[in-house]
């Protein structure tokens, strides 16, 4: 029986490259040179600057470098800025994986479309099975056309 998996994954190497590019861009910008920094810890990026408007500029630099590396910025969750002594700090978390709520939304969306496929939640992914390959391709087109707030990838397509 043909099937595929719906996942939300990030290429960690590309994320690291994007953050490195953002650091280089920060050094090139005259208005931000020496006034801010990016620190990466796994999938969390901490932005540090002297003022809040500089944090906003740095966040734009980070978003642009992620887009250049073909990383969807929907997975970027930006937290509120806070003061730490004389500096301002802000965290940006790159989300990965499909949580239970999003998985339920995906399954409900597939069921509401009344396609001839079944969707099942398996941890951080959703497995979609059907009798025909065409039904699965319809399900992929349906999911691509809907906005879930997270980038979705489709892998493990089996006949």
From Swiss-Prot:
One of its GO terms (cellular component) is cytosol. InterPro entries: DUF520 (IPR007551), UPF0234-like_C (IPR035571), UPF0234_N (IPR035570), YajQ-like_sf (IPR036183). GO terms for molecular function: nucleotide binding. It comes from the Bacteria. It holds the Pfam family DUF520. Keywords: Nucleotide-binding. Belongs to the YajQ family. Nucleotide-binding protein. NCBIfam families: PRK05412.1 (NF003819). This is Nucleotide-binding protein PST_3153.
